[in-house]
Amino acid sequence: MNRHADVPVIDISGLSGNDMDVKKDIAARIDRACRGSGFFYAANHGVDLAALQKFTTDWHMAMSPEEKWELAIRAYNPANPRNRNGYYMAVEGKKANESFCYLNPSFDADHATIKAGLPSHEVNIWPDEARHPGMRRFYEAYFSDVFDVAAVILRGFAIALGREESFFERHFSMDDTLSAVSLIRYPFLENYPPLKLGPDGEKLSFEHHQDVSLITVLYQTAIPNLQVETAEGYLDIPVSDEHFLVNCGTYMAHITNGYYPAPVHRVKYINAERLSIPFFANLSHASAIDPFAPPPYAPARGNPTVSYGDYLQHGLLDLIRANGQT
């Protein structure tokens, strides 16, 4: 029998209320989870995840190979200028999963960051509306919804870190967030590409990594696949398709001087049709939070201040170098 990591379910609704005692209790639970396995489930978030699953499943099944190629990012289709927004292709015999990544809907041709040509900023392209009616509207609304969930969760992190609950708000705004949503499909295949093995012999669909984000807010189909590295080895993360799975990214680890580490996790091989839809909660390009840690935690040497734009650009490149193009 596989062993499971301790991943608590935390009701986050109280973080939107006015009772500070309730907020402090939720923050304490977030603190224990992130200092433990590194993961927790956020319950009572207010998002219709069943609708998200159905819409995304139907959309993936309706996409033609020609559409995928036209939307493919530069790593797959050199004719396209985009590096983040677009389609991430499956590669026969090498890579089974495929995905579509989209960015902040606020980024348009007139946005100051787009005009400035800042790295990691792109105006979203979308599949043809006639073939996929309502897709853009649905996913732009979802971006707003999950952004709001992340903002609520960040109130809990701020309280847990001994700061004002609004601590992250000036850095995390819909106007200029570098956040992204990936609509990842892991298909069932009769002839699955060759698999890599973990050091413990586990067959893997995606190797060990840490998320390049402040926090990650994930919806996934209720099929066991994620594992987290612990002192006891890799443990399965329990599944739920009713709650969001939340973990810290490497920027949270950086600004807390390791108080909240970014958990090392991996995707084990399961040959089943399933979805993974992470929201990578990112700050703005210019945001730079001076690293700190709550007392009595006091590292011998603190981390340097790094702007979020530089962090994200280098972090994504490092992830590709280590694990290959997703």
UniProtKB/Swiss-Prot annotation:
Annotated ranges, domain Fe2OG dioxygenase: 183-283
Residues that coordinate or bind 2-oxoglutarate: R274
Pfam families from the UniProt entry: 2OG-FeII_Oxy, DIOX_N
Annotated InterPro entries: DIOX_N (IPR026992), IPNS-like_FE2OG_OXY (IPR044861), IPNS-like_sf (IPR027443), Isopenicillin-N_synth_CS (IPR002057), Oxoglu/Fe-dep_dioxygenase_dom (IPR005123), Plant_2OG-oxidoreductases (IPR050295)
One example of a Gene Ontology biological process annotation: antibiotic biosynthetic process
Cofactor: Fe cation; L-ascorbate
Keywords: Antibiotic biosynthesis, Iron, Metal-binding, Oxidoreductase, Vitamin C
EC class of the enzyme, as a word: oxidoreductase
Positions bound to Fe(2+): H209, D211, H265
GO molecular function: iron ion binding; isopenicillin-N synthase activity; L-ascorbic acid binding
Highest taxon, organism lineage: Bacteria
EC code(s) of this entry: 1.21.3.1
Metabolic or biological pathway, per its Swiss-Prot or TrEMBL entry: Antibiotic biosynthesis; penicillin G biosynthesis; penicillin G from L-alpha-aminoadipate and L-cysteine and L-valine: step 2/3
Positions annotated to bind isopenicillin N: R84, Y88, Y186, S276
Catalytic reactions on record: N-[(5S)-5-amino-5-carboxypentanoyl]-L-cysteinyl-D-valine + O2 = isopenicillin N + 2 H2O
Residue sites binding N-[(5S)-5-amino-5-carboxypentanoyl]-L-cysteinyl-D-valine per the record: R84, Y88, Y186, H209, D211, S276
Functional summary from the UniProt entry: Removes, in the presence of oxygen, 4 hydrogen atoms from delta-L-(alpha-aminoadipyl)-L-cysteinyl-D-valine (ACV) to form the azetidinone and thiazolidine rings of isopenicillin.
UniProt similarity note: Belongs to the iron/ascorbate-dependent oxidoreductase family.
The protein's name: Isopenicillin N synthase
Source organism (scientific name): Lysobacter lactamgenus
